[in-house]
Design a protein with these regions (language model features):
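Metal-dependent phosphoesterase core characteristic of DEDDh/y 3'-5' exonuclease domains
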Residues: 1-2, 22-132, 138-141
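Glycine-rich, highly charged phosphate/nucleotide-binding loops
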Residues: 6-17
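A short linear-motif detector with a strong N-terminal bias
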Residues: 8-9, 21-22, 42-44, 168-171
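Proline-rich intrinsically disordered, low-complexity coils
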Residues: 10-12, 25, 53, 79, ...
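Acidic catalytic cores of enzymes that act on phosphate-bearing nucleotides/polynucleotides
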Residues: 140-220
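Short, intrinsically disordered, charge-balanced linker/junction segments flanking boundaries
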Residues: 224-227
Length: 227
């Protein structure tokens, strides 16, 4: 507290300075896991100080992008040219400090704000150099409108989905079929993971599927139902 009082500035002033930087027209805010963490902290800070928490990321041609998802996609789809890091169980690790070390990128004081900034920039440059087409594709499709053009729920055209929710053991990657747009959230689409057993999805009624959805996994396994 003493150091903050001596060197810091009031939070409303701090939030205004961040807003000014993030609101420069036609810029993209990028980080490493920023969409799930840093951006949420930014939004909370803006909201707490009576600033629109979303406007900075879309107004005046602005956007946001998360390098972590690009790194995961690079590992799963175009791994050549990057030295990948693994944990003790042999699973791929996407921790920034491990990847920078594996690729000879200086990253002292990991999790120090500025050190992480320079490390993130270096990893982005590395992927752009080694896999330029992948980098460009993901950059051009960082926005919702571009992604919507790829989604065909009428034909349920399969898509490659990359997400940390899928797990490192499967490269955070899976084929999915878009089934329908979410009824209440226009930014979400309901998909089917095609890497699993979809027989139940094809043969059961909506009522039975709903019951299975809220049944314990152990009970489903006892009945021989795959989840």
């Amino acid at each position: 507290p003493q150091e903050c009082n001596e060197k810091g500035i009031p939070e409303p002033e701090f939030a205004a300075k961040i807003l000014a930087e993030f609101s420069q027209p036609n810029t993209c805010v990028m980080g490493y896991n920023n969409i799930r963490y840093d951006d949420e902290m930014t939004r909370y800070t803006f909201y707490r100080n009576f600033i629109d928490p979303y406007e900075y990321s879309w107004k005046n041609g602005n956007s946001r992008w998360d390098l972590l998802d690009l790194v995961r996609a690079c590992y799963a789809l175009r791994p050549e040219g990057i030295n990948w890091a693994y944990d003790d169980d042999g699973m791929p690790s996407f921790r920034l400090e491990k990847l920078t070390k594996a690729n000879g990128i200086e990253h002292e004081n990991a999790h120090d704000a500025m050190a992480d900034v320079y490390a993130t920039i270096a990893m982005a440059k590395l992927i752009k150099e080694k896999q330029p087409k992948l980098f460009q594709f993901f950059f051009e499709h960082r926005g919702k409108k571009e992604i919507e053009k790829l989604i065909d729920t009428a034909e349920m055209t399969p898509l490659v989905h990359v997400s940390g929710m899928l797990g490192n053991y499967r490269g955070n990657c899976a084929w999915v079929a878009p089934l329908a747009w979410h009824p209440t959230n226009q930014n979400a689409v309901i998909v089917c993971d095609l890497s699993g057993d979809i027989d139940n999805l094809l043969s059961k009624s909506a009522v039975d599927l709903r019951q299975d959805l809220y049944t314990k996994k152990s009970e489903l396994e006892e009945r021989g139902v795959s989840s």
